[in-house]
């Protein structure tokens, strides 16, 4: 009769079985923790009470019950020596007993966990997607099987444009170079499922003679599969179409620095903490570090998208030494020309200061004398200009050090006034005065 009633009873569902197993597992884990605490408590109590008892008995025996015979004293000392050994033996027994209990508890816990894992695998095989997902989220949240169930949804097919050839490339041809997955047991069905579910996303529309066009972006999981190690995380989809660019002007330093590199950076004072990062303006990739002094004046080409990033500022350039010497010569020539122009009006004023009576009494002889005087003045002016040109040529040939080494005051006194200061036309003024006196 009991067998018939047992057959008529309905079997418990998987959720009920898992709930019961979850409760048993929790109780076993609590018992294990409690057993560990009890072992520590009992061992500590044993040591505490045994030491107190040992001290009290030794004091009482020594003060009141110390025997007088030699054999009795030896027996009492032997008992006092055996008491610590007895306590140590009791401690080992307690530890063995509690360890045996924990081993039995752990065995039962492992059996329950194995049964639970087996039931969850059956749920993955037999139950529907929705029910299996609910059960796994409730009883096994840390499992990776939930991610296996979340397959990507295939996107709509791409319609070709008129006048263009549709090139269909299967996902298997594109993902030949994909590396093996991390989980070997679960990687092959996942990759095959993704490849079978996303054939439409791998289509490209391209016209003959034109660049390929991509209108649909792949799913994140397919991106994860197609991404190779070493490629930047912020790569643009159209960057794969660009041809490889020129090589970099400078090598990119590795991120991981060794102990020797750190010591050298500390001694020299040149490390990542003293540099600025070179970030590409287009793909925002890291292209190494630059010094603080050179950061604003550095122009670089990105190592990933080959975009030329211009410098933030232009470096100021110092003028050349030849230009400085030419500027000095120009200033000197300008000052000398102004002095010459002042001399000529002075001579004209002296001639015009003659009285009108003398101008009326001019004879042909006086006109000839004036013409001779004018020729003499012109010759003097030309000689002064030649001397000034020679001085300028000597100044241009000499270096700046020769200019700094000026002659002594005694030598300046011995030299004539025209050579010491060529800008002062003293002889010309004296000769013009003498000629004016002769005409008078």
Curated annotation (Swiss-Prot):
Q: Which UniProt keywords apply?
A: Coiled coil, Endoplasmic reticulum, Membrane, Metal-binding, Phosphoprotein, Transmembrane, Transmembrane helix, Zinc, Zinc-finger
Listed as disulfide-bonded, the cysteine pairs are: none
Subcellular locations according to the entry: Endoplasmic reticulum membrane
Transmembrane ranges, per UniProt, are: 46-66, 78-98
Output the superkingdom of the source species. Eukaryota
- Positions carrying Phosphoserine: 177, 179, 188, 192, 206, 215, 222, 231, 325
Q: How does it sit in the membrane?
A: Multi-pass membrane protein
Keyword Cytoplasm part of the UniProt annotation:
no
Q: Which residues carry this modification: Phosphothreonine?
A: 159, 198, 219
Report the Pfam families cross-referenced here: Zn_ribbon_10 (PF10058)
Q: Zinc finger (C4-type) residue ranges?
A: 280-305
Q: How is it modified after translation?
A: Phosphorylated. Phosphorylation at Thr-159 and Ser-325 occurs during interphase. Phosphorylation at Ser-177, Ser-179, Ser-188, Ser-192, Thr-198, Ser-206, Ser-215, Thr-219, Ser-222 and Ser-231 occurs during mitosis; these phosphorylations reduce both its homodimerization and the ER three-way tubular junction formation.
Q: Which residues form a coiled coil?
A: 16-40, 100-128
Q: What is known of its domains?
A: The transmembrane domain 1 and 2 function as a signal-anchor and stop-transfer sequence, respectively, generating a double-spanning integral membrane protein with a N- and C-terminal cytoplasmic orientation. Transmembrane domain 1 and 2 are probably sufficient to mediate membrane translocation and topology formation in a N-myristoylation-independent manner. Transmembrane domain 2 is sufficient to block the protein secretion pathway. The two coiled-coil domains are necessary for its endoplasmic reticulum (ER) three-way tubular junction localization.
Supply the name of the protein: Endoplasmic reticulum junction formation protein lunapark
């Amino acid at each position: 009769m009991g067998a018939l009633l047992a057959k008529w009873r309905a079997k418990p569902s998987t959720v009920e079985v898992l709930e019961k197993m979850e409760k048993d597992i929790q109780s076993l884990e609590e018992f294990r923790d409690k057993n560990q605490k009890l072992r520590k408590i009992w061992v500590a109590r044993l040591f505490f009470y045994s030491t107190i008892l040992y001290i009290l008995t030794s004091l009482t025996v020594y003060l009141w019950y110390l025997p007088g015979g030699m054999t009795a004293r030896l027996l009492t000392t032997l008992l006092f020596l055996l008491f610590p050994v007895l306590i140590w033996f009791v401690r080992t027994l307690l530890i063995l007993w509690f360890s045996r209990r924990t081993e039995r508890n752990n065995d039962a816990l492992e059996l329950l966990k194995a049964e639970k894992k087996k039931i969850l695998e059956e749920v993955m095989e037999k139950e529907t997607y929705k029910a299996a997902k609910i059960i796994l989220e409730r009883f096994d949240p840390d499992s990776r099987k939930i991610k296996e169930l979340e397959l990507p949804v295939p996107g709509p097919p791409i319609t070709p444009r008129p006048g263009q050839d549709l090139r269909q490339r299967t996902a298997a041809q594109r993902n030949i170079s994909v590396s093996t997955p991390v989980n070997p047991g679960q990687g092959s069905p996942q990759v095959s499922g993704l490849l079978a579910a996303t054939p439409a996303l791998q289509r490209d529309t391209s016209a003959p003679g034109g660049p390929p066009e991509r209108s649909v972006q792949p799913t994140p999981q397919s991106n994860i599969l197609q991404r190779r190690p070493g490629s930047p995380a912020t790569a643009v989809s159209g960057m794969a179409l660009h041809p490889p660019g020129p090589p970099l002007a400078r090598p990119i330093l590795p991120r991981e620095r060794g102990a020797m590199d750190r010591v050298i950076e500390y001694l020299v004072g040149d490390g990542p903490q003293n540099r600025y990062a070179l970030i590409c303006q287009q793909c925002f990739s890291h292209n190494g570090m630059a010094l603080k002094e050179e950061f604003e004046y550095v122009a670089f080409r990105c190592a990933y998208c080959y975009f030329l990033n211009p410098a933030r500022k232009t470096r100021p350039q110092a003028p050349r030494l030849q230009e400085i010497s030419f500027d000095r010569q120009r200033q000197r020539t300008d000052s000398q020309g102004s002095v010459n122009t002042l001399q000529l009006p002075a001579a004209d004023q002296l001639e015009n200061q003659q009285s009108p009576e003398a101008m009326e009494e001019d004879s042909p002889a006086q006109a000839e004398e004036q013409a001779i005087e004018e020729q003499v003045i012109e010759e003097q002016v030309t000689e002064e200009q030649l001397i000034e040109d020679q001085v300028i040529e000597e100044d241009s040939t000499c270096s700046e050090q020769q200019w700094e080494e000026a002659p002594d005051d005694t030598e300046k006194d011995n030299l004539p006034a025209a050579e010491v200061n060529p800008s002062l036309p003293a002889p010309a003024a004296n000769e013009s005065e003498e000629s004016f006196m002769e005409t008078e």
